[in-house]
Amino acid sequence: MAKKIESYIKLQVAAQEANPSPPVGPALGQHGVNIMEFCKAFNVKTQDIDKGMKVPVVITVYSDRSFTFVTKAPPAALLILKITGIKKGSGVPHLDKVGNITRIQLEEVASMKMKDLNANDMDAAVHIISGTARSMGITVEG
């Protein structure tokens, strides 16, 4: 018989920097999960992602206090900021433009996010990512 799922915990944790301090410790502690075991496993799994990049993670906690977790691609907004070299998006995106992004850069971000996006092909994924860029005050070229 399969284990009974007790709860799901959704967090954004910096890659390779999971530790028992907030927000990880309190979120896992209230469900009785071994915090250090999660931190070690998460840090190993995120070795290939840039250190410090926020990574969404969904932790499934079972009734016997064991757990599994799935990491997702970093948020599109963070990837866009990284690839364009911009520090932060515009506070008034329809008036103040803070930078430009090309179709090639959009495709690069879309390919990283493809498994997490609700898109059937690359064009649809690029369209989704370009919407995110526009909402940050970044001009989409091409």
Curated annotation (Swiss-Prot):
It comes from Ruthia magnifica subsp. Calyptogena magnifica. HAMAP family: Ribosomal_uL11 (MF_00736). InterPro entries: Ribosomal_uL11 (IPR000911), Ribosomal_uL11_bac-typ (IPR006519), Ribosomal_uL11_C (IPR020783), Ribosomal_uL11_C_sf (IPR036769), Ribosomal_uL11_N (IPR020784), Ribosomal_uL11_N_sf (IPR036796). Part of the ribosomal stalk of the 50S ribosomal subunit. Interacts with L10 and the large rRNA to form the base of the stalk. L10 forms an elongated spine to which L12 dimers bind in a sequential fashion forming a multimeric L10(L12)X complex. One or more lysine residues are methylated. SUPFAM superfamilies: Ribosomal L11/L12e N-terminal domain, Ribosomal protein L11, C-terminal domain. The keyword tRNA processing does not apply. This is Large ribosomal subunit protein uL11. Forms part of the ribosomal stalk which helps the ribosome interact with GTP-bound translation factors. Keywords: Methylation, Ribonucleoprotein, Ribosomal protein, RNA-binding, rRNA-binding. Belongs to the universal ribosomal protein uL11 family. Gene3D superfamilies: Ribosomal protein L11, C-terminal domain, Ribosomal protein L11/L12, N-terminal domain. GO terms for biological process: translation. It comes from the Bacteria.
